[in-house]
Design a protein with these regions (language model features):
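Juxta-kinase regulatory segment immediately upstream of eukaryotic protein kinase catalytic domains
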Residues: 2-46
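ATP-dependent phospho-/nucleotidyl transfer catalytic cores
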Residues: 2-8, 15, 139-239, 251, ...
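Conserved ATP-binding subdomain of kinase catalytic cores across diverse folds
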Residues: 48-190, 268
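Active-site acidic catalytic loop and adjacent metal/ATP-binding pocket
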Residues: 51-64, 75, 220-268
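Active-site activation/catalytic loop segments of kinase-like enzymes and analogous catalytic loops
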Residues: 99, 103, 262-265, 269-305, ...
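Flavin-dependent oxidoreductase catalytic core characteristic
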Residues: 135-138, 142-147, 226-230, 242-243, ...
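Short helix/strand-bridging catalytic loops that position acidic/His residues to coordinate divalent metals
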Residues: 141-149, 257-259, 276-280
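Generic recognition of stable, solvent-exposed alpha-helical segments in well-folded globular domains
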Residues: 151, 155-158, 237, 242, ...
């Protein structure tokens, strides 16, 4: 079962805001539950691996009562870590990803894991997606420590263009379910609070941030300037966390995006700049980023969006480059030190190259 090129099928099974409670523990992922959601008798559900991160990924092998049906490997994604599910906004994140696979994935032509079920409930507040286990099919996953070749990054930004064109011009009022979750902005401000900042940048293991970016107040001001309401016409539904660590690569080398947990309406350049800068080496980014932005814009137009040229969006790209500074604030509980340092180096170099801070705080000459 290869990754689908047009999302899930129009007949995706699932239910949003069901009054039937969804499982909150791995032990509740039973054969009777799979029988219920899949609509075919499941004889056994064997847990192969449990991976607990921001969301839990539970890999299982399903065997069916009908011997003619071959066993199936699936990945169940949702909130199955009790240490996290007690945090209300974490459940909101899981629900948001389920909403994406239910509402949006069937409508867009981009590589996505085939989805067997997507649901949310109003009892536990859980959000669950049951998808194909890509790992068992030979897929690999993006590693922030390993930059990508330019052609693969081009393929990825063209996929983002297809996503963006599908909801071009949308506002939070147009997609209300995508605005009812935890704010990334609140999370960043928490990480930039005085005590957290001091802890993050104390000692020799601090992220490789240039000295002029060590002014906490100035960096917070730049974030707030980036988040100010604008008259940008580049708004639509965005991935929100489009970095190399949230990708898969098929056995034939085709990339795709995963982890749709913070989708929201915002500027397309949030996704485009964040992905390009984090996925390429600094040298390749400097040599190719304008061409990649133009490739994105060309695909956006072919997919039904407006006809735009790089010069029309370049300042927006430069502004949203600053979002990558959030990597410097990521704690060891969020990402490994090696990944934080690698991504911080790439993003800070771009912030300097594009004079993003000066542009945001109004001091650019």
């Amino acid at each position: 079962m290869a990754a689908s090129t047009n999302g899930t099928s129009q007949g995706v099974r699932g239910a949003m805001k069901s009054s039937d409670p969804l499982p909150l523990t791995v032990e509740e992922l039973t054969a009777p539950w799979f029988t219920k959601i899949l609509g075919k008798p499941v004889q056994d559900a064997r847990v192969v691996e449990a991976i607990h991160g921001t969301a839990s990924k539970i890999l299982l092998e399903l065997t069916f009562e009908d011997s003619a049906d071959v066993p199936m490997r699936v990945c169940v994604k949702g909130g199955f870590n009790p240490a996290l599910t007690v945090i209300p906004y974490m459940l909101a994140v899981y629900r948001l990803e389920a909403e994406f696979y239910y509402h949006v994935a069937p409508t867009i032509r981009m590589p996505l894991p085939p989805t067997l079920y997507s649901g949310t409930d109003t009892i536990n507040g859980q959000g669950i997606v049951v998808m194909a286990d890509l790992k068992s099919q030979g897929y690999t996953f993006g590693n922030p420590l390993e930059t990508w070749p330019v052609d693969r990054v081009q393929t990825s930004v063209e996929q983002l263009a297809i996503l963006h064109a599908s909801t071009w011009g949308s506002t939070p009022d147009d997609i209300p379910w995508a605005s009812q979750t935890v704010s990334l902005r609140d999370a960043i401000l928490g990480l930039a609070a005085p005590e957290a900042w001091e802890k993050q940048f104390a000692g020799e293991t601090r992220p490789p941030v240039p000295n002029h970016m060590m002014n906490r107040e100035r960096m917070t001001t730049a974030f707030q300037a980036l988040w100010k309401p604008s008259n940008s016409t580049l708004n639509c539904l965005v991935h929100g966390d489009a970095h190399i660590g949230n990708t898969f690569i098929s056995p034939t080398g085709e990339p795709g995006f995963l982890d749709w947990q913070v989708i929201h309406t915002g500027s397309v350049m949030h996704d485009v700049s964040y992905f390009i800068i984090g996925a390429l080496s600094i040298e390749n980014r400097r040599n190719h980023e304008k061409g990649l932005v133009q490739s994105y814009l060309d695909t956006l137009f072919r997919a039904g969006g407006p006809r735009l040229q790089v010069e029309q969006v370049w300042d927006e790209y430069r502004k949203h480059t600053f979002h990558g500074f959030a990597w410097a604030l990521a704690t060891p509980m969020m990402q490994s030190r090696e990944i934080v340092h690698a991504m911080t180096e790439r993003h800070c170099a771009a912030i300097v190259d594009h004079k993003s801070i000066e542009l945001l705080v109004g001091t650019e000459e």
